[in-house]
A protein has these predicted regions:
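Solvent-exposed N-terminal domain segments of exported/luminal and surface proteins
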Residues: 3-103
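Generic structural hydrophobic/aromatic packing signal, biased to beta-strands
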Residues: 49-51, 79, 112, 122, ...
Length: 195
């Protein structure tokens, strides 16, 4: 679906606070070069997200955004700190031959983990596209600026809780950054989305 078309749009991101909320306004345009991976055009779409400055846990702790066909996570799950929607890991019901499919496997995501539908959005997050020390128009192929500090937060969920990247501080000094090892273990025969 690659088309030879120039997209001359500039990203817009504004952040402010009220007494209770972080308010983010964006036009849903990525800060890097847009590569069409679907037949949908890149369009500006005004977004405003309001998340609480002091998030609290939902007492019901029930799964949200579950599809009608069982544990299929669809649609809006949060937003990036660069002003783009984050959607669930699966696609919607169209096209029928890829319904609820894996957008990575179906090769419909750009190098930063996003594509267009109603507007540009991410299904996956590539840490190279979130380097706070210098934004690049081609973050995957351009040389990366030296990482002086890490942005531990890559975005926010609608409830205000941060979405963290792969780095964390080794201790409370705010200096030593590490990539922690996961203790996640997949048990044969169990679906990790529902257990």
């Amino acid at each position: 679906c690659i088309r030879d078309r120039q997209y001359n749009m500039m990203p817009r991101l504004q952040v402010s606070c009220t007494n209770e909320n972080l308010v983010i306004n964006s036009n849903s345009v990525p800060h890097y070069s847009f590569i069409p991976m679907t037949p949908n055009d890149l369009v500006e779409r005004d977004e405003e997200w309001r998340v609480p400055l002091e998030p609290t846990l939902d007492p019901s702790r029930e799964a949200t955004n579950i599809g009608a066909n069982g544990p299929v996570v669809l649609g809006y799950m949060g937003f990036t700190n660069t002003g783009l929607n984050i959607f669930g890991p699966t696609e919607g019901g169209q096209p029928a031959n890829q319904a609820y499919g894996d957008p990575v496997y179906n090769n419909i995501l750009d190098d930063c983990g996003g594509h267009t539908a109603f507007a540009y959005h991410n299904h996956a997050l590539n840490i190279r596209c979130f380097n706070p020390n210098g934004l690049s128009s081609n973050p995957v192929t351009d040389p990366q600026p030296e990482i002086i500090y890490f942005s531990l937060i890559m975005g926010y969920a609608p409830d205000g809780f941060p979405i963290f990247g792969p780095h964390e501080y080794a201790n409370n000094d705010g200096v030593n950054v590490i990539v922690p090892e996961s203790s996640y273990e997949l048990i044969d025969g169990e679906n990790p989305q529902i257990n």
